[in-house]
From Swiss-Prot:
Entry similarity comment: Belongs to the ABC1 family. UbiB subfamily.
Residues that bind ATP: 131-139, 153
Active site, per annotation: 288
Coiled coil (UniProt feature): none
PANTHER family, per the entry: CHAPERONE-ACTIVITY OF BC1 COMPLEX CABC1 -RELATED (PTHR10566), PROTEIN ACTIVITY OF BC1 COMPLEX KINASE 7, CHLOROPLASTIC (PTHR10566:SF113)
Molecular-function GO terms, alphabetical: ATP binding; protein kinase activity
Origin species: Pseudomonas syringae pv. syringae (strain B728a)
Protein name per Swiss-Prot or TrEMBL: Probable protein kinase UbiB
Amino acid sequence: MKLLAVRRLFRIQRVVIRYRLDDLLFALPLPWWMLALRFVLPWRWLPRRKSELSRGVRFRLALQDLGPIFIKFGQLLSTRRDLLPEDIADELMLLQDRVPPFDQQLAIKLIEEQLGARICDVFSRFDEKPLASASVAQVHAACLKTGEEVVVKVVRPGLKPIIGQDLAWLFILARMAERVSADARLLHPVQVVMDYEKTIYDELDLLREAANASQLRRNFEGSDLLYVPQVYWDWCRPKVLVMERIYGLQVTDMAGLADQRTDMKLLAERGVEIFFTQIFRDSFFHADMHPGNIFVSTVNPWAPKYIAIDCGIVGSLTPEDQDYLARNLFAFFKRDYRRVAQLHIDSGWVPAETKLNEFEAAIRTVCEPIFEKPLKDISFGQVLMRLFQTARRFNMEVQPQLVLLQKTLLNIEGLGRQLYPELDLWSTAQPYLERWMRERVSPKTLLGNLQSQVEQLPHIAGMTRDLLERMSRPHASDPPRPWHDRKDEPVLRLIGAALLVGGAIQGWVMSEAATQLLTLTAWPAAIMLIAGLYLIVRR
């Protein structure tokens, strides 16, 4: 292991020298003792010609030379456009996770070990030549004994030691950056590496990917928008995934889509609808929707349907995040920057002590120029990125779910405008958002929420009774205090008032909207009313 670490260190050093990454480092505002290293590094003693490559290109090529783990780290960095200079972020978007396949016989051996059966006992046909190969796994086409056409994904052998060493060096570099640079500390490099560590280890577990794919397939069962291939659970293991083989055109195959006369406007709009459906209806979204993972069905090109694969990375939002995100977008497009600032504070995305006026002014300064463009030219992803950049100056905490959301939105938006350059994302999304906001406050939704809470009321009633008993019997070791001397009296009266109002509202809703449930649910409302009255009038 130590030998591997030393070899990796020398490899990193060679790449740094080759692409002159030390020039990028010493261009930063570093402490004097770090800048003094320029004069003691042997390779800097020799005259060197000025590189013709930009810093972004050099950084990208260096990551490619360092191998798959650094490539995937660069891909993760490319999603953090709120942290990186624009030229570097643009170059990192070009990173391709393509590596030569590993030995076919070794792949067969690994599959047989995982399945506990011979290939010929499970598959009537197995193509030894892989369909695709990436840094974490490779994919083979096959046919099950029962006749279904499938693909078999198998994790590369021996990855964990390599990943462990590369992550160790990434953590060392991140900690050094945090110690020597105040600017670097604002970017939270250690947190970025920690996020990457979780992502890369999650991708090694194919059962997790299978579960994600099954969930996404269930969410869009019978949908005209998106198809997700079936997972064959009987043949899925931690390092082997067997799922339905799909046939379609890659979403970037513009010539093929044109040849089958695909309705490109509808295809682009459906991509936006899929995104907002995942975010606001399901709160479960495919977070790796780059063009390599998206296909278009060849059936019914006048009503095109997407096909999604590779569900290794997914994201989700809490109901609170959903609500704040929707209201942020509405407030932004109304140019209500004070509302945007207030929502960031209310949501906890920025500290509560943030000065509202200063935050509002910063958001206005960054975002107002965006509205000089027509709506169809405004980028949702850029809007989120600008908001995050501004909020970071006010100590916004890193929100992993929002980072995944921003990455997914940038992918969907870029793809939609590639398919149909005139796509007006706001006009496409606005009706969906408005409908979602209406549904959140509809009587049906409120009743559903109330009914789910009713199931908890017996437990709450028991807790209320215990609380009242404890308050009426002070602890033996504590001297009794007069009620009027108790500091918690205002709080208890406020709780009592809330119980009174809550009980009254519940009783009214049940009598108006669910008469058939009245006999079942009247007693929890009565308990709330009695408890509230007791807390208010007691002496």
